[in-house]
Amino acid sequence: MNRTTDRVDVVVAGAGMAGATLSCALAAAGLDVSVIESGPAPQWNGENYDLRVSAINLASQNILMALGVWPTIRQKRISPFDDIETWDEGSTGRIFFSAADAGLRHLGHIIENKAITATLHEKLKQQKHAEMHYGLSVTQCQSNDEEIVVTTHKGRVFRARLLVGADGALSRVRELAGIGLHQRPYRHAAIVGHVVTEKSHRQAAYQRFLSSGPLAFLPLADQRSSIVWSADTNLAEELLQLPNDEFQCRLGNAFQHRLGHITSVSHRERFALVHRHVERYVSHRIVLVGDAAHTVHPLAGLGANQGLVDAATLAEVLIDSANRERDFGGQVTLRRYERWRRGENQLVLNTLDGLYHLFGSGHPMIANIRGLGLNMTDRIAPLKMMFLRRATGLSGDLPQMAKHSRS
């Protein structure tokens, strides 16, 4: 890789899950990639639990296997989940998904975000076609028919065929590209933390739809669970400020003590929930992936998986174009990626919006309808299997990396 002129094939701004996944795939295919990350390199020591976790589905697992990082991630702290149980506070509705019913070993894995990103960064540092630049932020970009010139806040300049914005929900690349954004707050915030429960979670994920918002318990190692409690902003702030013993009591009651008493609770954090989707995924020699393009409500745990599939899809499109000796930073190539992913991501956003409003209503008639819907889905095997395939990520038009396990 030419390290004197900083002339590369692709510049990736942002090295979170989506950006690092894309960079690994491109570098493995022989494209020279410069990765610009505003923060420090992610560190994993295994001592403290990361409050941010992801429910990695089977499609995302396949992507991580294809990159050769899954075995290393497995050596860190991960927890498979074999069952998903969902029930509704306002009705008798309940649905239960089991890996065994679908002939699968697991439905997915709960993994701390730092365990994934740290492993991907370790992989990138081993790639001869990848170069990491920490503590840099993109401040300017200017494109022509041949290339895009990217300037950072420290004056470092990169010349490339393509700039990828993987720099999160507040994307600077998106702003520089002039790409419009549709966004609206959910008027909810999520409280995240870890708890230890009296009873074992039995490798199951649980979600209860409360009138105030969904509450999820996601299995971690031992009898520890990650919690994501979404509530209106006032209630979320109240929950955040409660002493631990009062919070444990409120949480246990909200969860109907499904796993017995909550014996301890970690430090908690709160973050706002916002629906975002860009008007377009591409500009002139610029393309967006992951949270830079879309953010969703966490009630289905799909955000990280969407970003990983974005990355795998864009990698497939770019590598195919490069192999055909076409302009992989040109509009024809980039529009192919946009057509592939925009509709799928919009479907997820619309579905989650619908669920958010459906389960957020306290109207008795709507509560009865959703209870009937949950129970009906639980009893109709083909319908239940359709939802299960959706949950595992194995439906829809997937890139090759997401389709097949390569263990």
Predicted feature descriptions by range:
Residues 5-7, 71, 77-176, 183-189:
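Conserved N-terminal helical subregion
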Residues 9-35:
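N-terminal Rossmann-like FAD-binding beta1-loop-alpha1 element of flavoenzymes
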Residues 27-49:
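Glycine-rich FAD pyrophosphate-binding loop
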Residues 50-74:
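N-terminal glycine-rich dinucleotide-binding loop that anchors FAD/FMN and/or NAD(P) in oxidoreductases
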Residues 316-407:
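C-terminal helical "tail/cap" subdomain of flavin- and related membrane-associated enzymes
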